[in-house]
Amino acid sequence: MTTAGYYAAVDWGTSSFRLWIIGEDGAVLAERRSAEGMTTAAKTGFHTILDGHLAAVSAPAHLPIIICGMAGARQGWKEAGYIETPAALAEIAGRATAIPDVDRDIRILPGLAQRDRRHPDVMRGEETQLLGAAAHLGAGSHLVCMPGTHSKWVRLADDRVEGFSTFMTGELFDTIARHTILSHAVAEADTFAAGSAAFTDAVSRTRENPALATNLLFSVRAGQLLHGTAAADARAQLSGTLIGLEIAGALAGSGSVDGVCLVGSGGLGTLYRTALESQGLNVRAVDADEAVRAGLSAAARAIWPL
């Protein structure tokens, strides 16, 4: 049976692929998910993977496709470039890159670049989440936290990105937990409770004394050796130390901040919400999956109006 639709929306990450068929009323008519991210697609072919998923939901041949994420990277399907900040979110759709020599209309959204020589930064994929999340925020200035392998903190003013900072918190956690002496402290625990005192105490201690971060990291191992800290608590301390360091850096120079928009989902979203609220910050949560779909929808409707 053919799945009718207005367009297909794709979030193509480094190691993940998500596709939604969207109807004219904005409803999700079909969905596909896989681990065929940019790394896989660069070997097997972006067009081949996309066509396979479209065929699996019997998408019509004329259906246009809007894509965000790593498919637009230099190593991706076709480089979509960057929009330089400060930039209005409304510019994103107008700067989409078309894929040539294909039998349907396929566009890839650009990323954002901050070319400040002292604070260079880039994002690709998160700008689409921002576009979707902005509808929930309204006018005024907002600080947006987008947790992930490389977390983004974005300064928004009236739907305009004034600047942003990336923190390698997720990647550092994985590296430290797997490949340093702290691996011995956390190896016996895969998870921990987000609301545990070990986690929130580590967030607070590191935010208060960010210059001591590496000392606090070593104390995770020392605490286990000297006081028998449980592996789950050690893992919570490691995570809390790194997230506390991130929060300290993100809020430095931001002036008085009493609230943060958190664009996240799942366990990671819960973890960051707990961390932020433990620091007395008001959190306005936006689901990350809903935000990326809303951003892709806004771009698609700007490019292909009904």
Curated annotation (Swiss-Prot):
<dbReference type="GO" id="GO:0005524">
    <property type="term" value="F:ATP binding"/>
</dbReference>
<dbReference type="GO" id="GO:0034194">
    <property type="term" value="P:D-galactonate catabolic process"/>
</dbReference>
<dbReference type="InterPro" id="IPR042258">
    <property type="entry name" value="DGOK_N"/>
</dbReference>
<comment type="function">
    <text>Involved in the degradation of galactose via the DeLey-Doudoroff pathway.</text>
</comment>
<keyword id="KW-0808">Transferase</keyword>
<keyword id="KW-0547">Nucleotide-binding</keyword>
<dbReference type="GO" id="GO:0008671">
    <property type="term" value="F:2-dehydro-3-deoxygalactonokinase activity"/>
</dbReference>
<dbReference type="InterPro" id="IPR043129">
    <property type="entry name" value="ATPase_NBD"/>
</dbReference>
<keyword id="KW-0418">Kinase</keyword>
<dbReference type="InterPro" id="IPR042257">
    <property type="entry name" value="DGOK_C"/>
</dbReference>
<dbReference type="InterPro" id="IPR007729">
    <property type="entry name" value="DGOK"/>
</dbReference>
<dbReference type="Pfam" id="PF05035">
    <property type="entry name" value="DGOK"/>
</dbReference>
<comment type="similarity">
    <text>Belongs to the DgoK family.</text>
</comment>
<comment type="pathway">
    <text>Carbohydrate acid metabolism; D-galactonate degradation; D-glyceraldehyde 3-phosphate and pyruvate from D-galactonate: step 2/3.</text>
</comment>
<keyword id="KW-0067">ATP-binding</keyword>
<protein>
    <recommendedName>
        <fullName>Probable 2-dehydro-3-deoxygalactonokinase DgoK1</fullName>
        <ecNumber>2.7.1.58</ecNumber>
    </recommendedName>
</protein>
